[in-house]
């Protein structure tokens, strides 16, 4: 009888140790995927995501393709799902190209969120959104209008690709605003750098050479904007208004030299943090619905908005958009206050 009891105790002890080990292994893991690695904007977002992970006791992995491709992102998504990750947060290179992989992941219980660039809303739970297309499109035009003060002007648009979700939405709104509020502005070309620094510089120089009387380049892309600024310096075009979106650390020398008077962005480190906090809430508690809020340390309250804020026609429970609290216009007076 005593021997039987000892065996039972040993079995229970072993079971307890195994359960404890399983509990340790069951700590949540979140994958944070950019459009591509090696770009300061995305690295900063990844830093914010990993900082939030440390604060929450969550393992956050930052990884992305070396080139912005649907196939590269799909491969990463599938790999993370097969490795047992609990949530995936992705900046999508295509609104629909990732959807089959993301829907399969959701069917396996993986929580899916997007940040920076969205998919179709039915392919994720929440989009951590830097601003609505109307907000960001208006911001682009207003920055250009601060410098182009003549009624008739020639404007070029220059960004990453014709298929990327976010930038095309902003540009669509920007062009609509130009048509309505600046009918004398002629949009002479729309070109793409495909998230490649060398190609972006070549494309920017090509635009400036092809349109010697160009008044402004609007470049809402982290590679395109510094490329446009460098091209203007290389070709000694000092009278060209260059505006768009990029990080302050990348753009600081161009602002200090006066090549770029102002440009915009949002706190992408904050965007990474918010993404992980929302994913953590989704993993630990009930899904948030439109109107629900979450308090994030050091940031404040964020609220779930309907997908219609982004122009979508899809709404569902546990699905929506989380807008960043603010956007920033950087210039020589404030750029040194930021480090990302």
Curated annotation (Swiss-Prot):
<comment type="function">
    <text>Part of the ABC transporter complex LsrABCD involved in autoinducer 2 (AI-2) import. Binds AI-2 and delivers it to the LsrC and LsrD permeases.</text>
</comment>
<feature type="signal peptide">
    <location>
        <begin position="1"/>
        <end position="26"/>
    </location>
</feature>
<comment type="subunit">
    <text>The complex is composed of two ATP-binding proteins (LsrA), two transmembrane proteins (LsrC and LsrD) and a solute-binding protein (LsrB).</text>
</comment>
<dbReference type="GO" id="GO:0030246">
    <property type="term" value="F:carbohydrate binding"/>
</dbReference>
<protein>
    <recommendedName>
        <fullName>Autoinducer 2-binding protein LsrB</fullName>
    </recommendedName>
</protein>
<dbReference type="GO" id="GO:0043190">
    <property type="term" value="C:ATP-binding cassette (ABC) transporter complex"/>
</dbReference>
<dbReference type="InterPro" id="IPR028082">
    <property type="entry name" value="Peripla_BP_I"/>
</dbReference>
<keyword id="KW-0732">Signal</keyword>
<dbReference type="InterPro" id="IPR030159">
    <property type="entry name" value="LsrB"/>
</dbReference>
<dbReference type="InterPro" id="IPR025997">
    <property type="entry name" value="SBP_2_dom"/>
</dbReference>
<dbReference type="Pfam" id="PF13407">
    <property type="entry name" value="Peripla_BP_4"/>
</dbReference>
<dbReference type="GO" id="GO:0030288">
    <property type="term" value="C:outer membrane-bounded periplasmic space"/>
</dbReference>
<comment type="similarity">
    <text>Belongs to the bacterial solute-binding protein 2 family.</text>
</comment>
<keyword id="KW-0574">Periplasm</keyword>
<dbReference type="InterPro" id="IPR050555">
    <property type="entry name" value="Bact_Solute-Bind_Prot2"/>
</dbReference>
